[in-house]
């Protein structure tokens, strides 16, 4: 379903997407379009896109096609979701220690909607770091 969501094909397009949106959250999925985890994540993002249209705009970026941000944002994972609001990187404390991004596929649509809503509400209040509605620190059971 990734072909239904807008793709950004250059670093300039990514910058313009982040800079131009003033009222909504910019959600960018960085990854490889052909990767299995990215496909799962894109499916979830596609299914929630209409539900969060008033809060967020969702874009996809293939890190092989647009390598400009790979070092800056440490895009080494198979799928990475980052959030921006009014040209500011929004951070979310998921309990994983990495507050900059979500670097695993979230397959639950409601969880993703809740995260987007939490970040959007925090961003509107001027917060740069928000607390996730769910703690993902025990996501892996050892």
UniProtKB/Swiss-Prot annotation:
Belongs to the DIM1 family. Plays a fundamental role as a protein essential for entry into mitosis (G2/M progression) as well as for chromosome segregation during mitosis. May play a role in mitotic spindle formation and/or function. May have a role in the maintenance or establishment of the steady-state level of the APC complex. One of its GO terms (cellular component) is U5 snRNP. It is found in: Nucleus. The keyword GTP-binding does not apply. The keyword Nucleus applies. CDD domains: DIM1. GO terms for biological process: mRNA cis splicing, via spliceosome. Pfam families: DIM1. This is Mitosis protein dim1.
């Amino acid at each position: 379903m990734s072909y239904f969501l807008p793709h950004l094909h250059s670093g300039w397009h990514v910058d313009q997407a982040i800079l131009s949106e003033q009222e909504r959250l910019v959600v960018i999925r960085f990854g490889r379009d052909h990767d299995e985890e990215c496909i799962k994540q894109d499916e979830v993002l596609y299914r929630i896109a209409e539900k969060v249209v008033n809060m967020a705009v969702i874009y996809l970026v293939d890190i092989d096609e647009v390598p400009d941000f790979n070092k800056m944002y440490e895009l080494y994972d198979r799928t990475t979701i980052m959030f921006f609001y009014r040209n500011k990187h929004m951070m979310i404390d998921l309990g994983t220690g990495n507050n900059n991004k979500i670097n695993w596929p979230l397959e639950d649509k409601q969880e993703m909607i809740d995260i987007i809503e939490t970040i959007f509400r925090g961003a509107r209040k001027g917060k740069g770091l928000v607390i996730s509605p769910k703690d993902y620190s025990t996501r892996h059971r050892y």
